[in-house]
Amino acid sequence: MGLNHLTLVCSAIALLSIFVVSQAGVTSTHVRVSEPSEEMPLETFPPPACYNAPEQVHITQGDHAGRGMIISWVTPLNEDGSNVVTYWIANSDGSDNKSALATTSSYRYFNYTSGYLYHATIKGLETLYNYMSNPKGQAVLFAGDLSYADDHPNHDQRKWDSYGRFVEPSAAYQPWIWAAGNHEIDYAESIPHKVHLHFGTKSNELQLTSSYSPLTQLMDELKKVNRSETPWLIVLVHAPWYNSNNYHYMEGESMRVTFEPWFVENKVDIVFAGHVHAYERSERISNIQYNITDGMSTPVKDQNAPVYITIGDGGNIEGIANNFIDPQPSYSAFREASFGHAILEIKNRTHAHYTWHRNKEDEFIPEAVIADSIWLKNRYYLREEETS
């Protein structure tokens, strides 16, 4: 994928804001007005009316080199031709059509029977100039907690179908790369499945399973990243490692203690997390000299460390997390109890511009408001420079 301009939209989704500034950072006094959280009924996104029409179409990156794409969709029936994807070069006359066969599966879960699930991998793709210059964003990063099906009896799988239709207008046209959250953990009716954790970078996605040492997998995966081809190293987790909100405080600590030294050593640029339903951005800090068990140790600024961004604020049925710790810790640069989304524009191999947008809340605010922004400098190429 071209490096001249890459845009990532991150979500987990007052005209004048007043900020409280401390030695630590900024705590926005803007708090989203608490309103009843109403879940959309299943009928809001019904199945398509056409016979055996594909639905819930979504794409995600399909290889480590950025030249593959996985196309996924669902149909009610498994008929001849339902498992074939036809594709061609953009702006061509269609005479060079190619096709890819998809794997097919279905499943039962309590009293639910799925449609037929298809996954086709297209390989050997080239990046076109009109795609590289697309201002709409080339990928969406989602840090977990998607449909909240697990909040319903028997983890109502119809919610996944409804969610798939809901996001299709975006997910069918730009790759979504997501981490699995706690709301994605489903269990068999009697025996729990193995827990999965997902890590992603710009050019790949790593799935960690309990059958293989996550640390060993992470070490192996980080060694594969060629920073001359993939200058920016971005990681997705679900539970944040640096979180100054009383909600889910220090729930990611055991993971941080295990993995953080490797993130610093390999100069990871950004770590995005969800889980906490608010927004927070850290300084470049590390705590690799400590093994925190009581929360009393203090992280230090470290220009080899990532910026940690909690962006679990994309909207949900559980409400906003508006209980920040006071005083604001020194590692916290900016935090706000609102819903929003972020845009990361990778300008080149050394610089990226990051903005966090507070979602529109009422009719008097015409669009999302940029409440936080920062220029980021690549840790691999500009490792000794300050980031702001």
Curated annotation (Swiss-Prot):
Residues the record marks as active site: H248 (proton donor)
Positions annotated to bind Zn(2+): D145, N182, H238, H275
Binding site for Fe cation: D145, Y148, H277
Keyword Zinc among UniProt keywords: yes
Reaction equation(s) it catalyzes: a phosphate monoester + H2O = an alcohol + phosphate
Tissue: Specifically expressed in flowers.
Chief place where the protein resides: secreted
Positions glycosylated per UniProt: N97, N111, N226, N291, N348
Comment on bound cofactor: Binds 1 Fe cation per subunit.
Top-level taxon in the UniProt lineage: Eukaryota
Protein location: Secreted
GO MF annotations in UniProt: acid phosphatase activity; metal ion binding
Any one GO CC term of the record: extracellular region
Entry binding sites for substrate: N182, H275, V276, H277
Keywords: Glycoprotein, Hydrolase, Iron, Metal-binding, Secreted, Signal, Zinc
Family, as annotated: Belongs to the metallophosphoesterase superfamily. Purple acid phosphatase family.
PANTHER family for this protein: ACID PHOSPHATASE RELATED, PURPLE ACID PHOSPHATASE 11-RELATED
Protein name per its UniProtKB record: Purple acid phosphatase 19
Lineage: Eukaryota, Viridiplantae, Streptophyta, Embryophyta, Tracheophyta
Gene behind the chain: PAP19
